[in-house]
């Protein structure tokens, strides 16, 4: 990864005209291709500053490496090593102000 792509993949969301009639998840999540493309943005820093921005101390580079290899089960287990509530943290974490801002 010589240079990180500055362009983030936006997370697909339900259309507002659809979601105003249901209580389903707004964020639809990435496709496999989008997740891998997003993981490929990581620079693999020798001293990853992103981890200093994570209050839960998730091993972000290892998590991203699993996603890059499409090992989503491994990525999930990597997060579980440090966070017992990954689904909740994933919804409320302002990653753009924490880990991503350190990158």
Regions found by a protein language model. Name each.
Residues 1-102:
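Ferredoxin-type iron-sulfur electron-transfer modules and their immediate structural context
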